[in-house]
Amino acid sequence: MKRTKSIHHASFRKSWSARHLTPVALAVTAVFMLAGCEKSDETVSLYQNADDCSAANPGKNAECTTAFNNALKEAERTAPKYATREDCVAEFGEGQCQQAPAQAGMAPENQAQAQSSGSFWMPLMAGYMMGRMMGGGAGFAQQPLFSSKNPASPAYGKYTDASGKNYGAAQPGRTMTVPKTAMAPKPATTTTVTRGGFGESVAKQSTMQRSATGTSNRSMGG
C-alpha cells in the first residue's frame, strides 16, 4: 500500500509540474518575442538637408551629402506624381512643387502622356530620415519625407513618407524610434495621383496608426 501511495504521489507531482510549466514557458516565449520586437526598431534622425546632418555629425560631411543626395533620388522615384501643377499645389501648397524628372518611376504609357501634356509634378522633398551612423560611417539608410503647407491637407505641417505614413511635426533636428520597415525603399510611383489623393492616404495611415497605438496601450494596461 505504501508503495502504491508513493507512486501516486510521484504521478501527482509530475502532473502538477507539467501543468504549471506551461504558463512559465509562455512567459519566457513572450519575453523573447518582446526582445525581438525591440530589435526591429531603429533610431533615426530627421534632417532638412545635408548641412543640418553635418552640423549634428561633425566630421561626417561626405556621408551626410551622400545620404541627402540618395534621399533626393529616392524622392524622385517614389514621391506622389500629379498630372498638373495645380493638382500638386492644391495638395502641398504654393512653392512646394516641382516638375518630376523624366523616367522618375513612371510607367512608359504615363511617360508618353507626360511628353504630350508637358510633364508630371511632384512635391519638393521637405526633409529626410537617416539611420544612426555605425562605425566607419557605414550602415546607415535614408528615407525622403514630404510635408504640405496647405492647411486644408491632412499632411499639413507634418512629415510623411511616400506611402503617406505620418512621422509627426515637420521639424528637423528631431530623433525618434521607428520600425526598421520605415527605412525600407518604397515602391516606385507608376501612376498619377488625383487631387487630394495623397492627403486621403495620409488620413487613412494616421487613423491606422492611432488604432494600432490604442490597441497596444489597451493590451499593456490589461
Swiss-Prot record:
Residues 177-222 are annotated as: Disordered. Pfam families: DUF1190 (PF06693). It comes from the Bacteria. Residues 177-194 have a biased composition (Low complexity). Residues 203-222 have a biased composition (Polar residues). NCBIfam families: PRK11653.1. Belongs to the UPF0441 family. HAMAP family: UPF0441. This is UPF0441 protein CKO_04429.
